[in-house]
């Protein structure tokens, strides 16, 4: 969590330099960008992140195998629903069943309950995006096949099975099929799922921050009352001691009674002070302070999650535009059915292949990082709750 927070903090500070800045400031900006890149790489090397990614990829492999082994075709909506529910039960930590049982056993704050609900919804959006990435990889196989066959056509290679004309016809057919495919990311980007989740999380973050401040004010007020009570106790005992001394000194036995009364009052005052110290120690971790800790952890986790979702939204939009551009090129080439247009399209695909792969990989890495952030914050809040009840 600390590495992820440091990485996000550095990322928020790393904006492009404005015009007119000195060379020294530009060098500092470049150094800052390099350090951000190192922190970026370090965040993806942590064991917890690697465990989350391995767990998700293993489940994706199991799900893909089960889909391939399924003999009877089923509607896409039902298959997506089964994938979604099974994947949620497998990856979300702590699972929802554990939280439901905890909510029945103990009374949780409404904001904490909302935090768990919204983090689960954010995980749902990430799972939907993960499904889209898997479909993008499947669709991209058509472009890979087109580039492979097109390379042979452009080089003038001849085969016994197919003539160059048949290979071109096969390429145009593959491009036409690719252009007819739906862009998987359009469903997320156009329906503004990220924006809906972002607004809900931002609203919760505002409420968590406000409640955290109120709890801190209450804790300060209670501490002030304790100090005021302690001072009042000292003043009261001092007044009693002075009164007893005056009475004792005006009596016949004042000389003998004064030391005894003074010692007795001092002893009582000391015992009261020790009892007060023990009471202050036992009440240090009060229910209010523990609730404040839960609210604070939930607010920090929500802040990081909002930044992660914003990053995912930008990366998904960028990749969505790249896919739409490829579909446009494929549609133009399939419609023209000219070898010159085909060669230009192949140059376009080959020239942007590395860029496309980098964008896909970066989005996938941030997606698994978001999974890790969700589970990490949920575990930390749950640890505070169970520590309170135990």
Swiss-Prot record:
Entry superkingdom: Eukaryota
Family stated for the protein in its record: Belongs to the UPF0496 family.
UniProtKB keywords: Membrane, Transmembrane, Transmembrane helix
Transmembrane portions of the chain: 228-248, 250-270
GO terms under cellular component: membrane
Protein's name according to its UniProt entry: UPF0496 protein At1g20180
Topological category with respect to the lipid bilayer: Multi-pass membrane protein
Alphabetical list of InterPro entries matching this protein: DUF677 (IPR007749)
Pfam family, one: DUF677
Locations listed in the record: Membrane
